[in-house]
Swiss-Prot record:
It is found in: Endoplasmic reticulum membrane. The keyword Transmembrane helix applies. It comes from Mus musculus. It catalyses: D-glucose 6-phosphate + H2O = D-glucose + phosphate. The gene is G6pc3. Widely expressed. Highly expressed in heart and testis and to a lower extent in spleen, stomach, small intestine, skeletal muscle and uterus. Expressed in muscle, brain, thymus, lung, kidney, spleen and pancreas (at protein level). In the brain, expressed in astrocytes (at protein level). GO terms for cellular component: endoplasmic reticulum; endoplasmic reticulum membrane. GO terms for biological process: gluconeogenesis; glucose 6-phosphate metabolic process; glucose-6-phosphate transport. This is Glucose-6-phosphatase 3.
Amino acid sequence: MESTLSAGIIMAEALQNRLPGLENMWLWVTFLGDPKNLFQFCFPAAYYASRRLGISVLWITFIAEWLNLVFKWFLFGDRPFWWVHESGYSTQTPIQIHQFPSSCETGPGSPSGHCMITGAALWPVMTAISSQVASRSRSPWVRVIPGLAYCTFLLAVGLSRVFLLAHFPHQVLGGLIVGAALGWLMSPRVPMERELSFYGLTALALMLGASLMYWTLFTLGLDLSWSINLASKWCERPEWVHMDSRPFASLSRDSGSALGLGIALHTPCYAQIRRAHLGNGQKIACFVLAMGLLVFLEWLGYPPQISLFYIFNFLKYTLWPCLVLALVPWVVHTLSDQEAPPIRSS
């Protein structure tokens, strides 16, 4: 295993020093592959393109992120930015590597969340685009473009994580494989417009299930805060250690999104607009308005206390599906003052 980890450091060093002109590209790619962006950008964009697709993206995202959290608790993967010091590798071998603001994530490293969650959530997007392309083109070369773009983007995300010293190559590979498999398995099985109790119980199961596993492992003598301690110890700058990278931050986001999805699907606003077919201009207006509300939510910031941070994060991601699915389309449709035509499947 030591040789595998050492090879990962060598690969990261090569990416940082032999391709210095690509630094900004890797930083941008890792930003695009951040699971948080799936909730904030990909989910609204997919929903306003297709109602079914948007709900699929949100559902798969929070289920995949929850599973990634559980996998990390059991696999105990080191991250390169702390392993290189803890193992003594940096004192035994002369290396030239440096950290970035995105390097200092506090959770365990295996498997890569960026690769696993993004790979799972973008699978229905890729298949939906592939179906559209296949219906309009007979060229086999054109038909493979969506799948090729999906693979290329995930490969770039994986390389960016190695470049940033956030993951070892084998953690990236594991995330890619598990993410694609999850996307393939879950896409046909996403629940659509179930009763509110179903989503409430899902949120409760995510919260209680992870908490039960955490306290069981803690009772058995396993310190699950070990990765937080190492990240704080070896990160070059304290301000690079962000609270939203902590394991329970993702748990509050996932359970909040599950509950918010159920609430959104049972609001009076959603009941009024679900029979409406929004035009392209209205869909663009919905996305722009949703992004404006997102900017406002981000502007509010987070409380510094960790417990209040988790509560605020839960409430924020409970509210977000309600805004995207119900309130924003209702406002746009009402202001446009158009008569809703019959239901169109999407």
